[in-house]
């Protein structure tokens, strides 16, 4: 296995921060989960709140303890996962990561793929049996094969702000993962090991400079979690949000996984988890082909299994999550709140 990484090293950006129970079960088989738990925050409960009414409902993951070895969410930043995996790869003589190696193009025949990539010393070529594009939402691999990325872009931007203040000490009974509904100023609030992260929407027309002004951010945070002092803003990010799925996850010997294959809004924490599930599913198929004489038709099965899940579950659920948080109709909003209360009673 050879990994081409365009950057000079693993990037330190926080990115995703939630590992769900099925993902932890999968990673446990690879010896990864214990290393993540050491660096993460176990979060057994999930809250739904309203900006004006407060706590609506609280879900306890312990109810699924008979179905998983990890009945909780683990809050642990994505960059920690990449470092754990890098360390594990060093134990394998047949695996390597080539840093500062930027994918350029790929062509394929019936029995191989030829990849061109650039380094500081120039253009290089490498041959392989299969190419798996896991290079993000702007995937150069996907684009090189003219695979459509169907879906839509939301007409707003998302801001994330990280602060060290203990929000559960500022707001009574605030959960470590809380989705706070409001027609225009909804928020997702997540407690990671070293900070609390606020995520909220802003108008598409607002510039980065305006969105990052201390006065604007402080005002938004104070509305969500009123605090007698000023919040200490450690990190702020701004990004556009898409809901898209690749037209196909397989084109001959070239396959897609993770954000290269599907992207969605972050409400529910399904992006990274879905990508890990892709990787586990696809690796099982490749192991069957290499070690057990399996047919390459298994790669079509990967597409048939994972792509419908992205469309019918992940896309549908994340779209619904956002709609529920920003619902403007008071009657629908009340009905949703009553449903949540009834489920947890």
Range-by-range predicted roles:
Residues 186, 240-243, 262-273, 308:
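Glycine-rich phosphate/pyrophosphate-binding beta-alpha loops
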Residues 12-15, 20-90, 181, 190, ...:
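Active-site-adjacent segment of FAD-dependent monooxygenases/related oxidoreductases
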Residues 247, 285-345:
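C-terminal helical "tail/cap" subdomain of flavin- and related membrane-associated enzymes
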Residues 1-16:
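Glycine-rich FAD pyrophosphate-binding loop
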Residues 86-87, 110-114, 124, 130, ...:
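Conserved FAD-binding catalytic core of PHBH/FMO-like flavoproteins
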Residues 90-104:
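A conserved beta-strand/loop element that lines the FAD pocket in flavoprotein oxidoreductases
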Residues 99-101, 117, 235-237:
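Short loop/edge segments at beta-strand edges and connector loops
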Residues 239-256, 260-262, 311:
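FAD-binding beta-loop-beta segment adjacent to the flavin cofactor pocket
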């Amino acid at each position: 296995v050879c990994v081409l990484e365009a950057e000079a090293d693993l990037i330190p950006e926080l990115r995703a921060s939630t590992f769900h129970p099925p993902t932890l079960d999968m990673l446990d088989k690879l010896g990864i989960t214990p290393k993540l738990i050491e660096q993460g925050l176990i979060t057994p409960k999930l809250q739904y709140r309203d900006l004006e009414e407060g706590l609506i409902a609280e879900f306890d993951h312990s109810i699924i303890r008979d179905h998983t070895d990890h009945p909780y969410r683990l809050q642990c930043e994505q960059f920690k996962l990449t470092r754990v995996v890098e360390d594990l790869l060093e134990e394998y003589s047949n695996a390597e990561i080539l840093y500062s190696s930027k994918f350029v193009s790929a062509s394929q025949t019936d029995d191989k793929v030829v990849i061109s990539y650039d380094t500081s010393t120039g253009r290089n070529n490498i041959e392989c049996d299969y190419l798996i594009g896991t290079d993000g939402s702007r995937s150069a691999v996907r684009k090189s094969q003219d695979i459509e990325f169907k879906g839509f872009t939301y007409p707003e931007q998302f801001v994330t702000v990280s602060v060290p203040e203990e929000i559960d000490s500022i707001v009574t009974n605030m959960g470590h993962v809380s989705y706070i509904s409001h027609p225009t100023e909804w928020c997702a609030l997540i407690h990671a090991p070293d900070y609390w992260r606020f995520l909220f929407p802003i108008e598409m027309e607002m510039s980065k400079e305006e969105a990052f002004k201390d006065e604007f951010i402080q005002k938004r945070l104070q509305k969500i979690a009123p605090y007698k002092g000023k919040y200490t803003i450690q990190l702020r990010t701004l990004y556009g949000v898409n809901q898209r799925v690749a037209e196909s996850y397989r084109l001959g010997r070239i396959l897609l996984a993770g954000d290269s294959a599907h992207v969605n809004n972050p409400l529910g924490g399904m992006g990274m988890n879905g990508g890990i599930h892709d990787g586990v599913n696809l690796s099982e198929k490749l192991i069957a082909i290499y070690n057990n004489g399996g047919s390459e038709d298994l790669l079509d099965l990967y597409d048939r299994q994972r792509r419908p899940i992205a469309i019918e579950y992940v896309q549908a659920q994340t779209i619904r999550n956002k709609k529920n948080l920003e619902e403007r109709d008071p009657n629908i909003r009340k009905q949703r709140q009553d449903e949540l209360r009834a489920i947890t009673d």
